[in-house]
């Protein structure tokens, strides 16, 4: 719950804000996803959050990453599929939550996200590619069972 409430806390906060004085943005991260990292920094250094699971759920809620924990997956999927989103196949992806495992939903959502980004509609983050490759392997392994 804490991660869900705080995941976008730094979304509109400039990197020059006093609350982010010690924050160093990671390399190779497009501007639209920087807030996930600055948000985790803000949660830890301003609000005193120490729970690694909460911090990771904030830190990777936009890009994903390989081998995410349950809280990370839930925040990622909730953020991507929230009621205010309106993009092709969003209803189908939401239905996945009721019908499939979190890992399968991660695979499908990351696949959609990569297609969108590769079509030139946004900057691609290496973490998203790594996350997709990880969940694609799980998807393939589950299909062979």
Regions found by a protein language model. Give the residues of each.
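Generic detection of intrinsically disordered/low-complexity segments and helix-coil linkers/edges
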Residues: 1, 110, 126-129
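Divalent metal-dependent catalytic cores for phosphoryl transfer on phosphate-bearing substrates
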Residues: 1-107
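Long, amphipathic alpha-helical surface segments
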Residues: 102-120
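Charged phosphate-binding loop/patch that engages nucleotide di/tri-phosphates or the phosphate backbone
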Residues: 115-145
């Amino acid at each position: 719950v804490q991660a869900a409430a705080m995941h976008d806390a730094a979304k509109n906060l400039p990197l020059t804000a006093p609350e982010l004085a010690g924050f160093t943005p990671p390399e190779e991260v497009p501007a639209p996803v920087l807030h996930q990292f600055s948000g985790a920094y803000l949660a830890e250094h301003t609000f005193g959050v120490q729970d690694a699971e909460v911090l990771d759920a904030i830190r990777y809620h936009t890009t994903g990453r390989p081998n995410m924990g349950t809280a990370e997956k839930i925040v990622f999927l909730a953020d991507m599929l929230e009621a205010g989103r309106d993009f092709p196949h969003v209803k189908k992806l939401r239905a996945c939550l009721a019908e499939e495992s979190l890992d399968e939903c991660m695979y499908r959502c990351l696949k959609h996200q990569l297609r969108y980004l590769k079509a030139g509609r946004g900057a691609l983050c290496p973490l998203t590619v790594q996350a997709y490759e990880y969940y694609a392997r799980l998807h393939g392994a589950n299909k062979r069972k």
